[in-house]
């Protein structure tokens, strides 16, 4: 695995999301060249694992309430104002393990997104994102491995909310870079729901920035957001 370290880390608004090129309903279709996108795998529910030494809390993604989303600012030919291209998927799995001191247990903490399942409001855009951009047939999984988290304290609160900040290694097409996520969470009887987001450039992950005739411009920044529903695992 190639690991890329970058000096700049952009942090975002709250909202686990990957954003790329879209236009809102009623806008002319963005003319991205379509690629082979027939292969996709359904997300499988997180499997139980044996207790880890030192583990005090294990949170797993529930079977519903989870969305990963990408967002990229673009401006189309013939339009005075730019708009966001947005695609999302509900095909994500994973878990977060924390020890008694509040540190992430990295070996058993990981989230996985099915790269072939992002859907926007335009089929041709989806083909471009899955095919030429993410190469989902070759690299079917986007992974996020948490390395630290702040805002989740033990014992887990039974109610209330908190701001969180998480650092994690994001891997797309076998290129890994550190990211910082900021968001908010709500606690309720052993569950943790909320959203978080980060941002990075195309170059950060060695991705090709789209250049097609119908686009006047595409922002260099990709926003990735995740809405999550985590439940504690005994």
Question: What do these predicted ranges mean?
Answer:
Residues 1-21:
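Sec-dependent bacterial lipoprotein signal peptides
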Residues 23-234:
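Low-complexity, acidic/polar, glycine-enriched regions of mature
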């Amino acid at each position: 695995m190639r690991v890329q370290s970058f000096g700049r880390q952009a942090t975002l608004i709250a909202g686990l999301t990957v954003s790329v090129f879209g236009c809102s309903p009623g806008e002319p279709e963005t003319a991205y060249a379509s690629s082979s996108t027939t292969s996709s795998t359904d997300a499988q529910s997180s499997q139980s694992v044996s207790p880890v030494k030192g583990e005090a809390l294990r949170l797993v993604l529930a079977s519903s309430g989870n969305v990963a989303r990408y967002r990229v600012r673009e401006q189309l030919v013939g339009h005075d104002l730019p708009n966001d291209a947005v695609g999302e998927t509900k095909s994500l799995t994973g878990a977060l393990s924390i020890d008694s001191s509040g540190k992430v247990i990295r070996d058993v903490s990981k989230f996985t997104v099915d790269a072939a399942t992002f859907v926007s409001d335009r089929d041709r855009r989806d083909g471009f994102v899955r095919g030429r951009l993410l190469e989902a047939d070759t690299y079917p999984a986007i992974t996020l491995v948490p390395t630290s988290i702040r805002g989740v304290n033990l014992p887990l609160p039974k109610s209330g909310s908190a701001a969180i900040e998480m650092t994690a290694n994001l891997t797309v097409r076998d290129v890994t870079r550190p990211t910082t996520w900021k968001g908010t969470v709500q606690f309720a009887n052993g569950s943790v729901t909320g959203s978080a987001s980060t941002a990075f450039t195309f170059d950060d992950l060695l991705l090709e920035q789209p250049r097609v005739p119908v686009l006047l411009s595409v922002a260099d920044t990709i926003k990735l957001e995740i809405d999550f529903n985590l439940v504690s695992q005994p």
